[in-house]
A protein has these predicted regions:
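Carbohydrate-interacting/catalytic domains
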Residues: 1-55, 82, 87-88, 361-364, ...
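Conserved alpha/beta catalytic core and glycan-binding cleft of carbohydrate-active enzymes
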Residues: 106-139, 143, 238, 242-420, ...
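Acidic/aromatic-lined carbohydrate-recognition and catalytic surfaces
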Residues: 2-186, 190, 203-263, 270, ...
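Hydrophobic "anchor" residues on beta-strands that sit immediately upstream
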Residues: 94, 98, 195, 252, ...
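Active-site rim elements
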Residues: 168-178, 225-230, 333-346, 407-408, ...
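Short acidic (Asp/Glu) and glycine-rich catalytic loops that position anionic groups and cofactors
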Residues: 217-220, 286-287, 329-334, 439-447
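Hydrophobic residues within beta-strands of alpha/beta enzymes
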Residues: 48, 196-198
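Generic, well-ordered alpha-helical scaffold segments in large soluble proteins
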Residues: 36, 87, 184-187, 191, ...
Length: 561
């Protein structure tokens, strides 16, 4: 495998709107990010991914871009962005941005021109189609609910939007449009950007027949991803995208890819794959309900363990995945993946250890490093997220009570991850001096950066030790390129794997069960590298031991001989 500059890096996702507000408007900004670069450096972060900061009406929190060449004034100026790039470079850190090119905003000048002339040049930048007998061209349900087709006023035409109606899909069959997108991407890379996280990219290839599918709900519609799955040829578009942009700059790219078959992995992340890496959503997909959040199944430990370890085995033959516990589109991992008895600092450290030491590129989401959890929501009116409001309506339509629908949103809403970063126990968690754009989690006085900075045994300081171990001179090679070998898969409540190469063998073993567990080693302990219950130097595990006892929520990382 050809070695790349990003293989041994640790990444951190910032949701700018909720990170830190420095100008008192209740919204996070670029100046806030600049002011916290040293904090991120102290965590061991190499790559910072910024969720969208482009000019936008913010119907979908910036994933509806109205100008690809401008910074949203809510976040700051292009000069401040350039300063961020320069300050990151001084610290040997890389900035990547969200790249949203499946769709744009309905306020983008291309779409505005298309609306004025639905038969003109710019209409072909989108998917305008005639309706059928007064109905939309096909029966697709958008990802946010309702038809994927929106009527163009005063005409018999509709335009396609797989997300909100304010997010018209771009027509990737149009070569002129593709070239304009490539020019824009290269403009940012020329600025000094190190790469992109690429949003919803599989959706760019449509089945141009737009066939109807069997309805899968009482609304008479079918999920739009069925149309995407029936389309062929996305690889050709992705290859052209890479060759015209990323490849020229040795840029780091991480794709948001769902519905991919295991046999397609080499094409996506192999030696000459479309992307540097793709996110591993195997655990997140376990809570996909048949109809949405309201019937999302509870995640079973054995299924979760099997999903992660199986994904590791199928991936390492070809390349790297980006490992996550949570992101801006998911609820908090501590609330989602840990049983109630483990939703404490020890359990949160345990979950972090298991994720960060997997083979692949770790992505830490803002607040994960202090153990932020889901918020308590008292009313649907407290939410901002467009998807949450849609799921609430869907739950009510399916017959759930308001209390049940609200509880489902509380478990799964994206707004759980979007509550403001908890910097201190001061008003609004130190995020802003104004009214925050989204409510602050009530637990901020107990869970915040300032308090954890002072506590050597905090989740934050544990994450620092964890990342430092992964990047240490002694173990960086092993944790980057070593194999991941599942272990103790038949032992109840135990999540374990070896990271090994020709020179070393390290066991990562965690007890997710509610009772003490005991395991017999294949070998003996040479050194304790990390423990979430004691300093490694003070560990009660003896060198030479051939058995390990783990309390509930205990994780050990040991060098084995």
């Amino acid at each position: 495998m050809e070695r790349k500059w990003w293989h041994d890096k640790v990444a951190y996702q910032i949701y700018p709107k909720s990170f830190l507000d420095t100008n008192g408007d209740g919204i996070g900004d670029l100046r806030g990010i600049i002011s916290k670069l040293d904090y991120l450096k102290s965590l061991g972060i190499d790559i910072i991914w910024l969720s969208p900061i482009y000019k936008s009406p913010f119907v979908d929190q910036g994933y509806d871009i109205s100008d690809y060449y401008a910074i949203a004034e809510e976040f700051g100026t292009m000069e401040e962005f350039d300063e961020l790039l320069a300050e990151a470079k001084k610290r040997d850190m890389h900035i990547i941005m969200d790249l949203v090119i499946n769709h744009c905003s309905d306020k983008h000048e291309w779409f505005q021109k298309a609306l004025k002339d639905p038969d003109g040049e710019y209409a072909d930048y989108f998917y305008f189609r005639k309706g059928k007998n007064g109905n939309p061209p096909s029966n697709y349900r958008s990802y946010f609910g309702g038809s994927c087709w929106e009527k163009v006023p005063g005409t018999d035409k509709y335009y396609l939007h797989m997300f909100a109606k304010e997010q018209p899909d771009l027509n990737w069959e149009n070569e002129k449009l593709r070239q304009k997108l490539y020019e824009m991407i290269n403009w940012w890379l020329d600025k000094g950007l190190s790469g992109f996280r690429i949003d919803a990219i599989i959706n760019i290839k449509k089945n141009l027949d737009f066939p109807d599918f069997e309805p899968d709900a009482e609304d008479g519609l079918a999920a739009c991803y069925k149309m995407v799955e029936s389309a062929e040829g996305v690889g050709e578009l992705l290859e052209e995208l890479k060759n015209n942009t990323f490849k020229k700059y040795d840029a780091f790219t991480v794709g948001e890819v769902f519905n991919m078959k295991p046999e397609e992995l080499p094409e996506f992340i192999g030696e000459n794959g479309h992307f540097s890496t793709i996110f591993d959503f195997c655990a997140q997909c376990l809570s996909n309900g048949e109809h949405g959040w309201y019937d999302a199944p509870k995640i079973d430990f054995d299924t979760w363990r099997k999903a992660i370890l199986s994904s590791q085995l199928e991936t390492e033959k070809y390349g790297f995945k980006a490992n996550i516990i949570e992101n801006h589109d998911e609820p908090r991992g501590a609330s989602r993946f840990l049983p109630e008895y483990a939703q404490n600092p020890a359990g949160i450290k345990m979950l972090g250890t298991v994720s960060v030491l997997l083979r692949g590129i770790p992505f830490i989401y803002q607040g994960q490093e202090i153990g932020m959890q889901n918020a308590k929501w008292n009313s649907i009116d407290e939410y901002d997220d467009i998807s949450t409001k849609d799921q609430y309506k869907a739950a009510l339509a399916a017959g759930l009570s308001k209390e049940q629908a609200l509880a489902a949103c509380g478990r799964m809403s994206r707004d759980n991850a979007r509550t403001p970063m908890q910097w201190s126990d001061e008003a609004n968690a130190g995020f802003t001096t104004a009214k925050p754009w989204l409510k602050v989690n009530e637990n901020y006085k107990a869970i915040n950066v300032a308090a954890q900075e002072k506590d050597p045994s905090s989740v934050l300081n544990y994450y620092r030790r964890l990342v430092a171990l992964r990047k240490s001179d002694e173990f960086k090679e092993l944790f980057t390129y070593g194999r991941c070998v599942p272990a103790y898969e038949d032992t109840d409540g135990i999540m374990a794997y070896y990271r090994e190469d020709e020179n070393k063998r390290v066991l990562v073993v965690a007890n997710f069960g509610s009772k003490e567990a005991q395991i017999r080693l294949d070998g003996s302990v040479k050194k304790v590298l990390l423990s979430n219950t004691n300093d490694a130097e003070k560990s009660t595990v003896s060198v030479g031991a051939s058995e390990l006892k783990l309390e509930s929520c205990e994780v050990l990382v040991v060098l084995v001989k």
